[in-house]
Amino acid sequence: MAFKLPNLPYAYDALEPYIDQRTMEFHHDKHHNTYVTKLNATVEGTELEHQSLADMIANLDKVPEAMRMSVRNNGGGHFNHSLFWEILSPNSEEKGGVIDDIKAQWGTLDEFKNEFANKATTLFGSGWTWLVVNNGKLEIVTTPNQDNPLTEGKTPILLFDVWEHAYYLKYQNKRPDYMTAFWNIVNWKKVDELYQAAK
């Protein structure tokens, strides 16, 4: 069964003014779609074609070596972006059990945001910043390229795309401005659902 590009759960312009329509169109229709196309070309006709993407990424060492790099890059790109679209929303409300536990662990939501933003804005090159559940505890981690915390046995619940294609049309080289804007469109309801399932 071929992997498919998911539809966005909102209109292309729904995240304005924080992420502009043109960026969303390029990011979803071009960049994400390319990962899906290349992933399908890699796994077509193999046993991986019938495996879940999460299992593939979590067990990357079991993927045949000839396909491993493509699954890591293109499978990671597909998984990461699919989750990224889900944790964004034009209706962002900072509430839920995950917010309570963030405050309990970091002291305040602002302290958490500051640490997350520092890791995101200082990440060299392209990659992702994540809030993960690791042995029942929340942790902020970064990964290069399209790598995913699942490979390290950690469950992602919130992620921030630090690739330039995610923000350059609107923010150019101002990654901190893009990071600040991100907090206005986080779908905390979805993040909390992922958190409760991962605990």
Swiss-Prot record:
Signal peptide: none annotated. Mn(2+) binds at H27, H81, D161, H165. Coiled coil: none annotated. InterPro entries: Mn/Fe_SOD (IPR001189), Mn/Fe_SOD_BS (IPR019833), Mn/Fe_SOD_C (IPR019832), Mn/Fe_SOD_N (IPR019831), Mn/Fe_SOD_N_sf (IPR036324), SOD_C_sf (IPR036314). GO terms for molecular function: metal ion binding; superoxide dismutase activity. GO terms for cellular component: cytoplasm. Its cofactor is Mn(2+); Fe(3+). Binds 1 Mn(2+) or Fe(3+) ion per subunit. Its EC number is 1.15.1.1. It is an enzyme of class 1 (oxidoreductase). The keyword GTP-binding does not apply. Fe(3+) binds at H27, H81, D161, H165. Gene3D superfamilies: Fe,Mn superoxide dismutase (SOD) domain (1.10.287.990), Iron/manganese superoxide dismutase, C-terminal domain (3.55.40.20). Homodimer. Can also form a heterodimer with SodA. Belongs to the iron/manganese superoxide dismutase family. Destroys superoxide anion radicals which are normally produced within the cells and which are toxic to biological systems. Catalyzes the dismutation of superoxide anion radicals into O2 and H2O2 by successive reduction and oxidation of the transition metal ion at the active site. This is Superoxide dismutase [Mn/Fe] 2. It comes from Staphylococcus aureus (strain bovine RF122 / ET3-1).
